[in-house]
Amino acid sequence: MKFIDMHCDTLMRFMQKSDTESLLSNSISVDFTRMKKGGALAQFFAMFLLPGEGSWKQAGIAPMTDWEYINRLSEQFHDDLAANSDLIAFAGNYDDMIANEKAGKMSAFLTIEDGRFIENDMANLEKSYEKGVRLITLTWNGINCNGLPHVIDPATQATNLTPFGKEVVNRMNEMGMLVDVSHLSDAGFWDVVDICKKNGKPFVASHSNLRSLSPHTRNLTDEMLKALAETGGCTGINFAPGFLDPDITAQKSKITDMAKHALKMKNLAGIEVVALGSDLDGITGELEIDSVDKIPMLFDELKKAGFTESEIEKVAYTNAARVIKDAMK
């Protein structure tokens, strides 16, 4: 069955890899060859902005500005697509994706994880669009011009988007960019709900699970999931062990837990809210699905859990495709 995965961190990992590896074939979790083998319709490739000088050193990468980093990764992304144009092509919206599929090609969407690069200047948002970016995760795990992230501290969770952050959400809705609330504070999430409802646009939690099954602050509460569904949005099931297991320190990611989250999501807010956001190449631990070509293993588990073929199709690609169609230009 074909699928759309709304989040992987593969591009970041290439900053650490040798020049002999590419998006066509590599030693990590996501490449075009295995995407094709698994039946991928589309993959969202995130440009994750490393959080500080220490993280650059830990990753073995020479520090650079956010825009130097974005330029470098986006150039590699587009170069690898051009070099493999028989297999895959860039998509900036639903029509692009469907045209690619009709031509026998997979689609690649470009995203940015951490909206700090906007730096209180809307021109930077527009510049990212010109580079092909169609989804932005508003925050990562630190404060930025848009707002605050998820944390255990109640005061931070209760902090709203900044006034500029609210303008960013409005502008993204206008431009045809998908707003992503994974990593955002709880209060910031509700601001996005209000703005997107007003604008008649869906949004996503590209790689988040349910807090009621795995009590990590990165996950959504039941009420958040329902509100997300009401806007026509969806959440991508994250394969990280600590976001699936009741024990947030767990180190084993189990397909049965993914199915439990999907089932509860369906029962709480309807099947239309459930999608995929693997977070491959951005997560650690013992992963039952450790490669993009193994994603269909989840569909087999959903069938065992009682999901119909139509429901599995919605999780695999239909729900994400609907949001792409409704949000992206």
For each feature predicted by the language model, list its residue ranges.
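Structural preference for beta-strand elements that scaffold enzyme active sites
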Residues: 2-5, 42, 89, 107-111, ...
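Conserved, mostly hydrophobic/aromatic
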Residues: 7, 35, 93, 132, ...
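Short catalytic helix/loop segments, enriched in acidic residues and glycine
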Residues: 18-37, 297-299
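A metal-dependent hydrolase metal-coordination microenvironment
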Residues: 29, 34-122, 141-143, 150-166, ...
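Short acidic/histidine-rich active-site segments
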Residues: 238-239, 269-292
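Mid-to-C-terminal alpha-helical segments outside catalytic/metal-binding sites
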Residues: 290-329
